[in-house]
Amino acid sequence: QQYTGRENIYLYGAVLGFSKKFLDEKLDEIIEFSELGKFIDVPVKNYSSGMKSRLGFSVATLVEPDILILDEVLSVGDAKFRKKSEAKIMSMFDKGVTVLFVSHSLDQVKRLCNKAILLEKGKIISHGSIEEVSKVYEEKTK
């Protein structure tokens, strides 16, 4: 069976430990943030990668967890949604949430992060300030 966006909100929310009642109360907010509107009842198999990312991000950031892991979540989708998502991440920082942000976009890392780790083949090759690590990254990608 192929689940719709709406059904995936409940499935993903359950995996994250949210109750059905809580998700019922937050459903409209999730759909609104995701901007999926008329597509929310379409099977997710028909979603673009950006639409899937919007849905997952909207559920994952519904409440401020202590730690949030975002793996390339902002690498897809349109600029407007990325900007809105970056603002959401910044507001989470302001509330003390730790975000592990995985990205190949140096611009995003510079905008969102205050520390960085550079991995190569699963090994840490640089860590520290954004300035220090970005210099190593830029040298490696020349």
Describe each PLM feature range:
Residues 103-104:
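H-loop/switch region of ABC-family ATPase nucleotide-binding domains
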Residues 121-122, 137:
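Conserved ABC ATPase "signature" C-loop
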Residues 109-111:
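A short, surface-exposed alpha-helical micro-motif characterized by mixed small hydrophobic
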Residues 61-70:
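A short, proline-enriched helix->beta-strand linker immediately N-terminal to the Walker B motif
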Residues 82-95:
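Helical segment within the ABC ATPase nucleotide-binding domain
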Residues 10, 22-39, 58:
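Conserved ABC ATPase "signature" region
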Residues 127-128:
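ABC ATPase "signature
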